[in-house]
Amino acid sequence: MAKKISRRDLIKNVGTAAGAATLLTVPAIAKQAQQTSQQSSQQTPQQAALERVLSQSSKQLLADHEDYQVEMTAGDMIVQFDKRYGSISSITRKGDEFGTNYLGDETNTPGVDPSDSRFTGDVVTTVWGLLGELQPAKLGQNDIFKVSGRWKHERTGKSADTRHVSFRNNVFAVKYDGPASEDEGIRSYRLNMSYHAGEGSSLVWDIEIENVTSQVLEIGELALPLMANDDYSGLYYEPGGPAALSGGGDVDFNRTPVRQKLIHEQKVLAHHFIAGHSSYVLLQRPLGDAPFLLVHPTMDTAFECTYKEPESAFTAHMQGWRGPDLLAIHSWATKNLRRWGSNPWVNGHTSLILKPGEKKAYQVRFALIPSYEAIREEVYNAGNLGIRVLPSMVVQEGTDALVELKSKSDIDKIKLLSDNITIAKQQRTGDKTLLTLAFKGRGQKSLKLHYGDGRWTNLHFYCINDIAQLLKARGKFVVDREFYKDPDDPYHRFHGFLPFDYRVGSTFLDSDEVWEVGGSDESGFSESLFLAEKNVYYPAKEEVDVLEAYVEDCLFKYIQNPQTYEVRASLYWKDRYPSSGWGHWTKERSEATFRSYNYVHPANIYHALYRVGKRYGLLMRKKPEEYLRMSYHTCMRWFGTGPWRHIGLMEGSNAIHILADIQREGWKDEHDKLLQQMKECAQQMIDDPYPYSSELVIDQTAHEQVYFFTKFFGATEKNRKTVQVLKALRGGNQPVWFRYGNDKRGDICCWYNASLNGLALLDSGDPIAATLKDGLNKRIRFVEDKVDVETTQGEIQRVVWSKSKRSLELEMDDSTGLAKTAALTIQGLEKGDYKVSYGGSSKKVSSDGALTIEAPMRDARNIRIQKA
């Protein structure tokens, strides 16, 4: 019998010679080892073991671990249930090469305590337990208000003795009937649930709650755990082992390739839009490949809030993973118990009231979908709102926000929940309601849309002031409030930049994590880097003077060694107590220079000052070329320092622009040396299947540099893959301001690297796809690019134009049945040679800006034109 190896054992063993022997006990790995022994003769045992593991699919690596008891098929969806808990343990796709389970279970999330479970399929409630007969509240001037009861938790995870599970006729049914023996078990209501296959590749979950008490029942919390397979930390921590005080887990670079493989192929990201009946959650692999799993309420079911319970017994033994998401249909008790009274969630909080014997039904649907665009269609088909917004959910004053609401019925009423919202235009076209909105005054702007017999969906925008003025105001604030001017500072932070504490209205000088106030690291460089880049576009003499003083008196004197160009970890340090945490760095630790990330920031600060000097002539202390040379030397140190030197770093893509300016200055030797370092870095990114790691468990700091480097060095396939991975970071397209267009990092939205990754997505030039619906289908113009497509024979059904890829795809047809040949002319193309493909063949043609193509109509359903 084959010896099984757990995921953590797999990770633990990779990277050690002893680990090679353990890995070879797995039959598939042993067989592969035999086949590759000759090729690996020049490798160390460690390298050979790692290569053998990476050569397998992640599906093979984990194949021995899945053990489910009940299975249901719905189209391409395979659903597996665990009869012990009455929960869904797995949703996979038929034929998936990775066999990814979208949901979390005891296998992919080891360490959870099933005795208080919150698996997908569990129900978490909090009811108001009356202390006696409910009496009308007396609220007069002299009346004494008496609380009628207290909140009491009732959960399926504590109701095993009343759980009844059955599987008949392809229906999985779970019932909780009778009072549970445990205190937090279900006692106040009867719960009936069932699962059946829906249309296409979908699963439908029906829930019915019935009040079995003799009194009015208030359910102040009714939440459905969605346990996604998103325990990334489990790949870094040993179950029951000590927590890594740095918060980064065990970042062992010998194990990183396997960890990244498992993260991208076996884990999922969860994107939430929680705003009423049109709510949804999108689960997808970080790899970004379709299909995705969409979870959304149907019928009269609305999610109003989402949260986690990291302190629950279910996750008490976990390290780094905070538990499943709870999708709350009602959350009034949650607000009260968590003391959110002064800070309620954006949709408000409600309770469910049931009279004795009264029932309430809910429904949730799980569906495999082929694309991001399909989210809107599925929500629309459920009778809710498919929402599109342009240009964004964060809108500056004076900019219109355009909203398209695809719905089966018109909007009944729009309630404005914030001040200074103007609905400039509202019209119904076909099955779409089009809104033009305008906002005034900074802050959240919320609208409640009522439609479809009592359904509702909230839209939450955020209004900001003029962006240019905000950038200028931020620059002034950095100079006025964060530029440190104490020449007697014992840590040499004079003329450095320190963070600002809004709680006390001052910069702060001390922190338990010393790097926060030490001038280096992201905490130390954020102000100076912003200020330098801001002055490239909006120069201010005072700010440039401050930047030069910063470089001369602090950065290039104490933070960075002016002789060696090494960058220290922190100027600030502490004497340690026996009780000190990891962040209390000693003087010796603060002087460490191995962190690759600390080099890219000063390199870019110097490069910004070079550009400021070249463009505006505002420099007083150094010439522009001196700053460029400092940037060059820092880059060379960057590409040769630390374990992260050849992975992507935030702003790392700017090395391409530094290289271009060095070439422009005619520094051939420096150009060639830096180019060679960049080539080596890019090659490692190309060779690594998933070059998106970090010093942390999960991060988004690598992607931007990987994208621009692979583009610069012509690695088309890795560049395409990186775009796909980048899209997955913000794949939900949730129309709410704090999630729309923001990278998802673990549980965090609005992650600081979203703007840099946004540069990559904007640069990738997503193609413009258009389906012609003007009734003629003869002509289309891409206005911004001045490209015209016109057909004289046949009709254009669909066209996809990509400026960045210099390609055009057409789908043509002929409604008359008389045209045997499709004939079209394209104007506005870049001059040069083009590859024209259709009908399984291709040819090269030259264009002076115009191109005429004729193709048999039978082959015109797929015509592709690509710049050669």
Predicted regions located by residue number:
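Catalytic cores of extracellular degradative/oxidative enzymes
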Residues: 478-748, 752, 756
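Low-complexity, Pro/Ser/Thr- and charge-rich linker/hinge segments at domain boundaries
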Residues: 231-237, 378-398, 456-499
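Extended, loop-rich substrate-binding clefts of extracytoplasmic carbohydrate-active enzymes
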Residues: 64, 125-206, 212-214, 330-350, ...
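N-terminal export signals
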Residues: 9-30
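Carbohydrate-binding surface patches
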Residues: 782-830, 854-861
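Beta-strand-rich recognition/accessory modules
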Residues: 49-66, 71-73, 84, 265-393
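Polysaccharide-binding surfaces and accessory modules of carbohydrate-active proteins
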Residues: 50-54, 61, 68-70, 105-118, ...
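C-terminal beta-strand-rich structural cap/linker in extracellular carbohydrate-active enzymes
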Residues: 371-373, 846-868
